[in-house]
Amino acid sequence: MVKAVAVLKGDSPVTGVITFTQEKEGAPVTVSGDIKNLDANAERGFHVHEFGDNTNGCTSAGPHFNPHGKNHGAPSDSERHVGDLGNVKTDGNGVASVNISDKSLSLFGPYSIIGRTIVVHAGTDDFGKGGNAESLKTGNAGARAACGVIGISN
C-alpha cells in the first residue's frame, strides 16, 4: 500500500488535510479528508494539478494533470484529465468532507500524482460542459482558493 498527504493552504482562509491511499498498482486511489472555511452549502472544483511547485502560491502548480492530452470532464467521463476530481460539497459551516475513490489516479509509476499539487477552487466545476474553450481546460472552476503538494507518507 502507498499513502500520501497534502496540507491545503493559500491566500484565502481555506485550509485542509487530504490523504491519498492506494492498495496496489492499478487499484483505485482513495482521496479523503476535510477542507474548512469554504463557502457554505456550495460546490467547489477539486483537481490535481501538474506541478508540485507552490513558490508563487497555487498559481505555479500549473494546469490540471493531463498526461493523455484530453479535454476537461467529470470524474465519470472517459474524456477527462487524470486530475479531474469534480466538485467537493460543503455543509452549512463551509466544511467539505472529501471521500472519493478514483480509478484514473495513481500513486505508482510514471503517472503518479505524488509530487504534484491538489487544488480546491473558488468556483464550481462545470465538467467541461460550459460551452466555451475555458470549460474544456479548467471547467470554469475559477481562482485557486487553497492547494498543497502531495507528499508520500507512512
UniProtKB/Swiss-Prot annotation:
Disulfide bonds join 58-147. InterPro entries: SOD-like_Cu/Zn_dom_sf, SOD_Cu/Zn_/chaperone, SOD_Cu/Zn_BS, SOD_Cu_Zn_dom. Keywords: Antioxidant, Copper, Cytoplasm, Disulfide bond, Metal-binding, Oxidoreductase, Zinc. One of its GO terms (molecular function) is copper ion binding. It catalyses: 2 superoxide + 2 H(+) = H2O2 + O2. Zn(2+) binds at residues 64, 72, 81, 84. Its main location: cytoplasm. It comes from the Eukaryota. Its cofactor is Cu cation; Zn(2+). The keyword Zinc applies. Belongs to the Cu-Zn superoxide dismutase family. Homodimer. PANTHER family: SUPEROXIDE DISMUTASE CU-ZN -RELATED. This is Superoxide dismutase [Cu-Zn]. It comes from Cryptococcus gattii (Filobasidiella gattii).
